[in-house]
Amino acid sequence: MAEKRNIFLVGPMGAGKSTIGRHLAQMLHLDFHDSDHEIEQRTGADIAWVFDVEGEEGFRRREAQVIGDLSERQGIVLATGGGSVQSKDIRNYLSARGIVVYLETTIDKQVARTQRDKRRPLLQVDDPREVLESLAEIRNPLYEEIADVIVKTDEQSAKIVANQIIEQLGF
């Protein structure tokens, strides 16, 4: 696996993709990118605005373009959006262009980590837990389908999880 130089982090909201990704990139001396941040940079607006104006379909179109572009680079760690795996094109990009690491977490941890975050449009509802459970049913099999490595993120610091990923990848 070590011949694939890019590392792509997939997993649900609140799994720690961005935080762990930054640690991982620093430890491996790779460039770090976050697909949501890149979308915001390219549009000049936050994700919530893109959802409001263009809907989820418009956001997903932008996400596929951004991940397609970023995954063509070499030597990066990319934190993807939680729903990106719902796109077959994105799953194909990630599988073909790097090592895919699924950061797995429980619904309880997701709720705890995202409850005060107003930047997550899909969770601005009365019962975010119900939304997270519904998304998990759809997305978890897709994360598993493309994962080269699965790492649980519930009980450990981001730095420890990054070290576990490095060990599992043999870097």
Swiss-Prot record:
Cofactor note: Binds 1 Mg(2+) ion per subunit.
SUPFAM superfamilies (alphabetical): P-loop containing nucleoside triphosphate hydrolases
UniProt cross-references to InterPro entries, sorted A to Z: P-loop_NTPase, Shikimate/glucono_kinase, Shikimate_kinase/TSH1, Shikimate_kinase_CS
Presence of the UniProt keyword Metal-binding in the record: yes
Domain of life assignment: Bacteria
Positions of substrate binding: 36, 60, 82, 139
Native source species: Shewanella frigidimarina (strain NCIMB 400)
Name of encoding gene: aroK
EC number(s) stated in the UniProt entry for this protein: 2.7.1.71
Descriptive protein name: Shikimate kinase
Subunit structure: Monomer.
Keyword Nucleotide-binding (UniProt): yes
Known role: Catalyzes the specific phosphorylation of the 3-hydroxyl group of shikimic acid using ATP as a cosubstrate.
Catalytic activity: shikimate + ATP = 3-phosphoshikimate + ADP + H(+)
